[in-house]
Amino acid sequence: MSHRILLVDDEVDILEFVRYNLVREGYEVFTAENGAEALKVAAECRPHLILLDMMMPVMDGAQTCRAIRRNPVLKDTMVVFLSALGEEGQQLAGFDVGADDYLTKPIKMKLLVSRVQAILKRIDADRPPEKAPA
């Protein structure tokens, strides 16, 4: 079974680069360019994991993560921030709004893929993933 990942970033080059590499690893990848769009896509595709940029227009990563945690359907979805904001306080703020992990840009693909694999392995061990709505 293919895991569903929602990748959210307002930089199209990053979306395409990360999506390409995750698809090569066998994941089904959905994308959104801001938080508001991400919430709509997440409600439709029910991702196992959300990779979320912090700085975006319309709705930033912190607002998006808070909304995910308040949503009864999405609240248990794993969220990993991928952000250029790398200071300790900024990372702690990400955890404060509900992130499960925080990686800084520039993205190191091998590290990201390893982190994704580890998270999804834990998800599979904890509970069977839900099916996407028909």
Where does each model-flagged region fall?
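Charged docking surfaces used in two-component/phosphorelay signaling
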Residues: 16-24
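Acidic, metal-coordinating helix/loop segments flanking the phosphotransfer/catalytic sites
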Residues: 31-49
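Receiver (REC) domain active-site loop signature in two-component systems and cognate sites
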Residues: 56
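C-terminal output helix
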Residues: 106-117
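CheY-like receiver
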Residues: 123-134
